[in-house]
Amino acid sequence: FSVRESSQLADIHYTRQGDPLGLGHAILRAKSHVGEHSFAVLLGDDIIDARDPLLNRMLEIHQQTGDNVIALLEVPAEQISLYGCASVTATDSDSVIVTDLVEKPAPGTAPSNYAVIGRYVLRQEMFQILEQTAPGRGGEIQLTDALQYAAKHTGIAGGVRGVIFTGRRYDTGDKLDFIKATIKIASDREDIGPDLKEWLKEYTKSL
């Protein structure tokens, strides 16, 4: 692995959330660093393979439409209650118009199987909406609630578009998923993948 000085990669700032008051609250903590610009939110426990240019496509759609853009993944009905869920309308491009969102719907009540995953491109005006968003599910300030408001009041912070992702994604939200993601990513590497796969074959014989 090669290591480079972080100063050569980006201008890095950080802030502490303090109390776990929701994703919307965490994003508000970065307001002073964003200024008057649109910005991207990338959740660290949602890994997208760099060979699948999801964020680049989201940025293109944002630049073309001026809308907020979220990443969507079609999931089985029994899993949708684990995610924010989007109602969508098809367009003539590879993006969809998001008409409504609900945070972790109760089983059997989801409006679709499109789950919101951890990539967002947001307009600066979303900070203003988040500041006015009351605590929702779990007593937290939910980004999903703010995006729902934006989807229904497009004149305030632009509309909301979705990009339906079909590439390689790894959820590392718990210990087992983290281990699975590490093995999958490592086995796909050209330098160590072949040796790792051979070791895995031998190791699993003993299980």
Model-derived segments and spans:
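Mixed-charge, polar/low-complexity N-terminal
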Residues: 8-9, 14-15, 21, 28, ...
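Short, flexible segments with low predicted structural confidence
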Residues: 1-3, 98-99
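Alpha-helix boundary/capping detector
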Residues: 29, 49, 56-57, 152-153, ...
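Conserved beta-loop-beta/alpha segment of the NTase-like Rossmann-fold superfamily
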Residues: 2-88, 124, 130-133
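Short, structured coil/loop segments at alpha-helix boundaries
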Residues: 1, 189-193, 205
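Catalytic-core segments of class I nucleotidyltransferases/pyrophosphorylases
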Residues: 40, 59-63, 92-198
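Intrinsic disorder at enzyme termini
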Residues: 196-199, 203-207
